[in-house]
């Protein structure tokens, strides 16, 4: 028995000591002292529009009151600020100062569509924000619908880009977490919000809709229930897929090197030396005179939390570097931002017996449905493309010698070349009969031939002779030779016409040795190419409704 007690005592000594709760109830005298609120206390209980992810700046929940009726309050010891005692508002509970802080690591996410950017922007929402609402925008199996984050700055940036050209998107992110807490089950409402609710009609219909929309405009659609506070740096880079293909690069290669450069700017060197060296080799190979983030600089950057007013991009900005990053990290415990959070719709703050609760629920549901954005995936792909088996909203190509699976040309100068009409007149090939004429056509190592027009000095060939995909600038002249057919081995060449082809439709006239020639040809640059010889990069703009439409914009 004694041995058992001794063993139990040893085991108890080996157990970790209980961590003291950081918060305690303080007496009236201690509460009257000049204590600050816990950092970021005002962030919980604030209104948010879930479609734009914009904080409204208005507060449905009152986070200013901290004294109980008996004069006591809750004070919390902030280990991240030298154990300073700080006030916890009555509306908040379960406050914790987390020790995880910042990891010096850049995470990357690759997306290929605007709705994927919207989903990525809304990933900070850690719960199902739709609970209790009826959000049913344009229900159909061939439509991709986005609501949360659909009007966020990142989604608007991506939508604008995808209407300008073919893009892929890459997000580099650094996150830090320092504090967590949440709003109590039945929080005190802010006096202004109470007054706004009091002004609402008891029912929601077409005539009362403006009053409810006014409330949503001021307060948002949801309030923040629980938070994780700290900081986040995110850089969303837009990459022109086909321009990269013409430069002999893939979006994955560029994204890898962007992440490497971001890691260097936050002070990571040793563990990525091999990757950094590989990126330097790529720069030399492709004759790049600037860094990857300077070369590919179509970017939307956001910094959440901390002091950063002079630097808006801490990963790729001109002034970005380890010192600036460390200064930002050091400012986060005193000035944290919203990293992750849960949301609840505003109507749950009203009493279940209040008729305005159901009216507000219906107003929120209607507003969110109207704000949804979608992409119609039932539209057919352009000629030469097909639906992706992985994503019915994406059109892809069969990879070939001249195009990638992303439907991008593999090199500059590519065009489709065809001769569409040939006419000759005044030919003289035989002494005693009219000419038996045919035409040979040459370009880029190819030879095509017309049929023979018998016994005619003024023949016409209304045919299409297609050279297919050619290199317009380097394929040599487009050469037409007019021949008089005899026995086949001693045919007579009546003349040659050479023309350096240019993009577009053209008519050419030539004088032959024995007659005259006229022909028409058409050279069409492959998509994303332009200029006289198709050497220029040309963005491919999307047809259809541009982004930014308030109600149901199509992506």
Curated annotation (Swiss-Prot):
Cofactors, names only: Ca(2+)
Residues that hold Ca(2+) 5 according to the record: 486, 491
Record: residues binding Ca(2+) 1: 429-430, 484, 486, 492
One annotated GO biological process: protein homooligomerization
Major location (coarse): other
Keywords: Calcium, Cell membrane, Cytolysis, Disease variant, Disulfide bond, EGF-like domain, Endosome, Familial hemophagocytic lymphohistiocytosis, Glycoprotein, Lysosome, Membrane, Metal-binding, Secreted, Signal, Transmembrane, Transmembrane beta strand
Disease: Hemophagocytic lymphohistiocytosis, familial, 2: A rare disorder characterized by immune dysregulation with hypercytokinemia, defective function of natural killer cell, and massive infiltration of several organs by activated lymphocytes and macrophages. The clinical features of the disease include fever, hepatosplenomegaly, cytopenia, and less frequently neurological abnormalities ranging from irritability and hypotonia to seizures, cranial nerve deficits and ataxia.
Transmembrane portions of the chain: 129-149, 257-279
Protein name, as recorded: Perforin-1
Gene assigned in the entry: PRF1
InterPro entries in the record: C2_dom, C2_domain_sf, MACPF, MACPF_CS, Perforin-1_C2, Perforin-1_pore-forming
General function of this protein: Pore-forming protein that plays a key role in granzyme-mediated programmed cell death, and in defense against virus-infected or neoplastic cells. Plays an important role in killing other cells that are recognized as non-self by the immune system, e.g. in transplant rejection or some forms of autoimmune disease. Can insert into the membrane of target cells in its calcium-bound form, oligomerize and form large pores. Promotes cytolysis and apoptosis of target cells by mediating the passage and uptake of cytotoxic granzymes.
């Amino acid at each position: 028995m004694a041995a058992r007690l001794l063993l139990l005592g040893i085991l108890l000594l080996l157990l970790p000591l209980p961590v003291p709760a950081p918060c305690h109830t303080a007496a009236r005298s201690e509460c009257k002292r000049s204590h600050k609120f816990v950092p970021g206390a005002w962030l919980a209980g604030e209104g948010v529009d879930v479609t734009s992810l914009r904080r409204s700046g208005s507060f449905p929940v009152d986070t200013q009151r901290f004294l109980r009726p008996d004069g006591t309050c809750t004070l919390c010891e902030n280990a991240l600020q030298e154990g300073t005692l700080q006030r916890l508002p009555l509306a908040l509970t379960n406050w914790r100062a987390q020790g995880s802080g910042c990891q010096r690591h850049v995470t990357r996410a690759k997306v290929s569509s605007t709705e994927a950017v919207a989903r990525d922007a809304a990933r900070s929402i850690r719960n199902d924000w739709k609970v209790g609402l009826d959000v049913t925008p344009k229900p159909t199996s061939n439509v991709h619908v986005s609501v949360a984050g659909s009007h966020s700055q990142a989604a608007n940036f991506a939508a604008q880009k995808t209407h300008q050209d073919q893009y892929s998107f890459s997000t580099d992110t650094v996150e830090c977490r320092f504090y967590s807490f949440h709003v109590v089950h039945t929080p005190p409402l802010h006096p202004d919000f109470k007054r706004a609710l009091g002004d609402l009609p008891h029912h929601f219909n077409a005539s009362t809709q403006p009053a409810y929309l006014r409330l949503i405009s001021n307060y948002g659609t949801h309030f923040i229930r629980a938070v994780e506070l700290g900081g986040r740096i995110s850089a969303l880079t837009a990459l022109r897929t086909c321009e990269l293909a013409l430069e002999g690069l893939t979006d994955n290669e560029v994204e890898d090197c962007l992440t490497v450069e971001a890691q260097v700017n936050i002070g990571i060197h040793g563990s990525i030396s091999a990757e950094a060296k590989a990126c330097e080799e790529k720069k030399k190979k492709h004759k790049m005179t600037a860094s990857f983030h300077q070369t590919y600089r179509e970017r939307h950057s956001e910094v959440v939390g901390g002091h950063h007013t002079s630097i808006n991009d801490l990963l790729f900005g001109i002034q970005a570097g380890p010192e600036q990053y460390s200064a930002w990290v050091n400012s986060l415990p005193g000035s944290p931002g919203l990293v992750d959070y849960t949301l609840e719709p505003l109507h749950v703050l009203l009493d279940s017996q209040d008729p305005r609760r159901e009216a507000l629920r219906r107003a929120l549901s209607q507003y969110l449905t109207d704000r949804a954005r979608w992409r119609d995936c039932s539209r057919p792909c352009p000629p030469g493309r097909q639906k992706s088996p992985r994503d019915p909203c994406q059109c892809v190509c069969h990879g070939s010698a001249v195009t990638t699976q992303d439907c991008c040309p593999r090199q500059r100068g590519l065009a489709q070349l065809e001769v569409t009409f040939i006419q000759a007149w005044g030919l003289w090939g035989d002494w005693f009969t009219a000419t038996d004429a045919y035409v040979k056509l040459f370009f880029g190592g190819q030879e095509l031939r017309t049929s023979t027009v018998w016994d005619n000095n003024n023949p016409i060939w209304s045919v299409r002779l297609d050279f297919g995909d050619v290199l317009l600038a380097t394929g040599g002249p487009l050469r037409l030779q007019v021949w008089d057919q005899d026995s086949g081995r001693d045919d007579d060449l009546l003349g040659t016409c050479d023309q350096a082809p240019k993009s577009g439709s053209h008519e050419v006239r030539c004088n032959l040795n024995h007659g005259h020639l006229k022909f028409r040809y058409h050279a069409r640059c492959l998509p994303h190419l332009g200029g006289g010889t198709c050497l220029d990069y040309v963005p491919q703009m999307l047809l259809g409704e541009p982004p930014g439409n308030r109600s149901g914009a199509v992506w």
